[in-house]
A protein has these predicted regions:
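Cyclophilin-like peptidyl-prolyl cis-trans isomerases
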Residues: 2-3, 9, 13, 20-195
Length: 195
């Protein structure tokens, strides 16, 4: 009997989480669409978790800063990292040696860590240096769960469609910390409300 109640609890909980993420995806102002070579990835941004980070991402999207930026670090089974708008633009000034070390001209952001959300497949988090208050423009999309990141990196969204396309992003060499030779890119990034 208790096992049945526990199972029912988890079914209800899963439904609430799905409904919560779907509700964010239904908000065009907080829906980011990334065009990849094989199609579009839709991300529900989470201003409820990270209002400053989401605001900065949306500004960079609207400034077209993310267009043509490489997925410079991609580790199979872990994550795909992009967003280095200083050194990662494949059409303007791509620097294979420096990509991953740059950000935007906007200020770095104070950490907005969540204890309620966890790093799992499809979660989008902000990359940073050792300083927890150093996130700027780079972000990553998770291929699978990574509990060590929970409460250590700011969560900014969830992939709501197109995760199969994220899975196809060219992977890097694990021996080289996922550095990708001839990387895939974000062709275009937009906020759904701006169509």
């Amino acid at each position: 009997m208790q096992l049945r109640r526990l199972a029912s609890f988890f079914v209800v909980l899963a439904g609430l989480v799905t409904a919560s993420v779907s509700a964010y995806a239904a908000d065009p102002e907080n829906t980011m669409i990334i065009t990849l070579k094989d199609g579009d990835v839709t991300i529900a941004l989470r201003p409820d978790l990270a209002p400053k980070h989401v605001a900065q991402i949306k500004k960079l999207v609207r400034d077209h800063a993310y267009d043509n930026v490489a997925f410079h670090r991609v580790i199979d089974g872990f994550m795909a990292q992009t967003g280095d708008v200083k050194f990662g633009n494949m059409n303007k000034g791509f620097n294979a040696q420096a990509v991953g070390t740059g950000g935007s001209d906007l200020p770095d952001l104070p950490a907005e860590f969540s204890q309620a959300e966890h790093y799992k497949r499809g979660v989008v988090g902000m990359a940073r240096s050792q300083d927890p208050n150093s996130a700027n423009s780079q972000f990553f999309i998770m291929f699978g769960p990574a509990p060590p990141l929970d409460g250590q990196y700011t969560i900014v969204g969830n992939v709501v469609s197109g995760m199969d396309l994220v899975d196809k992003i060219k992977k890097g060499d694990e021996a080289e910390n996922g550095t990708v030779t001839d990387p895939d890119r974000m062709i275009k990034v937009r906020i759904a409300a701006d169509k």
